[in-house]
Regions:
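Extreme N-terminal leader/targeting segments of oxidoreductases
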Residues: 1-5, 22-23, 425-435, 468-477
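N-terminal glycine-rich phosphate/pyrophosphate-binding loop and immediately adjacent elements
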Residues: 2-133, 420
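Rossmann-like flavin
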Residues: 89-198
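Conserved FAD/dinucleotide-binding core of flavoprotein oxidoreductases
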Residues: 105, 262-266, 295, 354-381
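A glycine-rich dinucleotide-binding beta-alpha-beta segment and adjacent secondary-structure elements
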Residues: 176-193, 208, 337-341, 388-452
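Helical element adjacent to the flavin cofactor pocket in flavoenzyme catalytic cores
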Residues: 203-246
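Mid-domain catalytic core of redox enzymes
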Residues: 238, 242-353
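A conserved FAD-binding loop/helix module that cradles the flavin
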Residues: 447-470
Length: 477
């Protein structure tokens, strides 16, 4: 029987392992940590009974993933009443609603423009998803199908907008400062300066996802998604070995490595050709993250009551403020007043905390590897929009870049995307190669978020790498 070894049990490693097992290969996954899941792990970080997602919580791309849908995973997806909220200093909030029309209604004089920009993309979601989460290079048939749905001119405009900078897009397309700030909050998920390309594309993608599939999370924590993927693999005969670090590339017909480039270099022990190794050494990591988890005595007391309907809240005020925060993180400067992304899943999932209590987390972007403690800055931003928040904190748990990387080696310097996703590294990830998953070593493939389509919980990096491996096996047979 053809044997495959997968290094890493994050969503991409597990997705790749499942794809290989479905094709009849004997699959073994090695996970260095005692708990499987990579960025999908959950734990009681603060107090007993309070379940926190150690890294990722909200998974629009997980719901959108065609591979995850095909697997019919045993996961109970929960949806907040609204995907996201953006509170402002005047006590109001701008909302991303599931309904496009309800969202537009909250954008004032930008409502009609928003409908014209976003409506066609939402209506064409199935075709958009094939381009957004498909393999690299994007199959021509996927672009042709999207062109058929949108029309040639609208497709060209959508591609132009998606590859642009968020600040340029917001100032060109929207006239209301509230709308510009709201869009900037979505675009800042890119971990890019808003003046850098393609930050606009991240903002547009997350907004369209909010309308098309929502911003859901697994009941009981992200670990439930990891466990469901692991159960599917075991059902297919695959094995998972935890507390099983790998120090060199194993001998197998297929090796899928859910690792970042520098880890592949370490595992290769000089076996990789120098030209390829040189490209891997120049792979760039983006800013890191600083995250605080809270056990709370009650829900966060938002001044804007609408924020209580959202699973995710963006805390940054204006476009100018968000831009300054993201530039600071990118340029390696102290962040000062940080843009904070906050998740409050226990409002919609009572399994996350004891009766009447709640959990939440907030994180901000910081310079890669920064040792600065951002707890006070993050909590000040929450208090700014929710006076009395600090009085509700029963316990807190903070993780800076070093702690995040210790938790997951792929988070180099706290970089949540396993590599900067600016235009060059979005299109050529991790190297300029027609098939980026295939390494020069026969049978060895890279399948982490350092390959297309990049960061996020969707499993498509692993699935795409596995498909390449299976095609190569057929050719070698």
């Amino acid at each position: 029987m053809t044997r495959a070894v997968v290094i890493g049990s994050g969503p991409n490693g597990l997705a790749g392992a499942i794809a290989l097992a479905r094709a009849g290969l004997e699959v073994e996954v090695h996970e260095a940590e005692a708990q499987l899941g990579g960025g999908l792990r959950s734990a009681e970080l603060t107090l007993p009974g309070f379940v926190h997602d150690v890294c990722s919580s909200v998974h629009p791309l997980g719901r959108a993933s065609s591979f995850f849908r095909m697997l019919e995973l045993d996961v109970d997806w929960l949806e907040p009443d609204a995907p996201a909220a953006h509170p402002l200093d005047d006590g109001s909030a701008v909302m991303l609603e599931r309904s496009l029309s309800e969202t537009a209604a909250g954008l004032g004089r930008d409502a009609d423009r928003y409908r014209r920009l976003v409506g066609p993309l939402v209506d064409s979601w199935s075709a958009v998803e094939r381009v957004l989460l498909g393999p690299y290079p994007v199959p021509p048939r996927a672009l042709l199908r999207l062109g058929d749905r949108l029309g040639t001119r609208r497709l060209a405009a959508a591609l132009h907008d998606s590859l642009g900078a968020a600040r340029d897009f917001a100032e060109r397309e929207f006239s209301d400062e509230r709308t510009r700030a709201w869009f900037a909050g979505h675009a800042a998920h890119s971990i890019l300066p808003l003046e850098r390309r393609p930050s606009a594309g991240f903002g547009l993608a997350l907004i369209v996802l909010g309308h098309a599939v929502g911003w859901p999370f697994p009941q009981g924590g992200s670990q439930q998604l990891a466990d469901a993927l692991a159960a599917k693999l075991r059902e297919l005969g695959g094995q998972i070995r935890t507390s099983s670090p790998v120090d060199s590339l194993p001998s197998a017909d297929v090796v899928l490595a859910d690792v970042v480039p520098r880890e592949l270099l370490r595992l290769g022990h000089g076996r990789l050709p120098e030209r390829y190794a040189r490209h891997l050494r120049t792979y760039r990591h983006g800013p890191g993250a600083f995250k605080v988890d809270w056990a709370l005595d009650a829900p966060i007391p938002w001044r804007a009551a609408k924020c209580r309907r959202a699973g995710t809240v963006h805390l940054g005020g204006s476009l100018e403020e968000i831009s300054a925060s993201e530039w600071g993180a990118w340029r390696g400067r102290p962040v000062g007043q940080p843009f904070v992304l906050l998740a409050q899943t226990s409002l919609f999932d009572p399994t996350r905390a004891p009766a009447g209590k709640h959990t939440a987390w907030g994180y901000c972007h910081v310079p890669n590897g920064s040792a600065e403690d951002m707890t006070e800055g993050i909590e000040a931003q929450v208090e700014r929009f929710a006076p009395g928040f600090r009085e509700l904190v029963l316990a807190r748990h903070a993780m800076g870049p070093a702690e995040l990387e210790a938790h997951n080696r792929n988070l180099v310097g706290g970089d949540l995307n396993a590599g900067a996703m600016d235009l060059g590294q979005l299109l050529f990830r991790p190297v300029r190669k027609l098939v980026p998953y295939r390494t020069p070593l026969e049978g060895v493939y890279l399948c982490s978020a350092a390959t297309p389509p990049g960061g996020g919980v969707h499993g498509m990096c692993g699935y795409s790498a596995a498909r390449v491996a299976l095609k190569d096996l057929e050719r070698r047979a």
